[in-house]
């Protein structure tokens, strides 16, 4: 199976995660998207909300969309959520699957700062969601890497389908001007204004946040 992996703190999970993931699934004809909540993200500040609540919210989204499955290997680990470690575990547990790790252009620009980042290409394909506002400078090492990988894929043509790892797939996605930080601030300031939140969050996530009084 061809599996997309989308990691994040999901604090909370919102349409800015959900819609691009569905667009990637359709663009690359993936069988499923696995949502992988972080426990201790190594590249940014830790989550504001506890593990159990973030896990429950992701599970709610998975129950609403059969395109998604919950992948809990990172959130159950007490060490930093290094992507290479997670993908090593996944490829060992599911050797029959072909994994596509999904990231935004903002993350791809900084990929060379990630722990053992080059090993990722031995474990999976990389999907780069191209959204407005993020441009790769021609002098960037990542720009060179993307150009080389995309050229290699063009030369290989149909044979790329037989390669289970090592490619970069740029995917144009619809702009989603949504961030978890802004959602948390909005909830804190407005005390759960459903009308304002409904374009940002699924209804069952709004209900969950309200029920458990999160982000107050």
Swiss-Prot record:
Signal sequence coordinates: none
EC nos: 2.7.7.18
Keywords: ATP-binding, NAD, Nucleotide-binding, Nucleotidyltransferase, Pyridine nucleotide biosynthesis, Transferase
An MF annotation (GO) of this entry: nicotinate-nucleotide adenylyltransferase activity
Pfam families in the cross-refs: CTP_transf_like (PF01467)
UniProt keyword Transcription, yes or no: no
Source species, domain of life: Bacteria
Pathway: Cofactor biosynthesis; NAD(+) biosynthesis; deamido-NAD(+) from nicotinate D-ribonucleotide: step 1/1
A Gene Ontology biological process term: NAD biosynthetic process
Gene3D superfamilies cross-referenced by the UniProt entry: HUPs
InterPro entries on file: Cyt_trans-like (IPR004821), NadD/NMNAT (IPR005248), Rossmann-like_a/b/a_fold (IPR014729)
Reaction catalyzed: nicotinate beta-D-ribonucleotide + ATP + H(+) = deamido-NAD(+) + diphosphate
Keyword Transmembrane (UniProt): no
Enzyme class: transferase
Disulfide cross-links: none
PANTHER family: NICOTINATE-NUCLEOTIDE ADENYLYLTRANSFERASE-RELATED (PTHR39321), PHOSPHOPANTETHEINE ADENYLYLTRANSFERASE (PTHR39321:SF3)
Protein purpose: Catalyzes the reversible adenylation of nicotinate mononucleotide (NaMN) to nicotinic acid adenine dinucleotide (NaAD).
Membership in a protein family: Belongs to the NadD family.
Listed name of the protein: Probable nicotinate-nucleotide adenylyltransferase
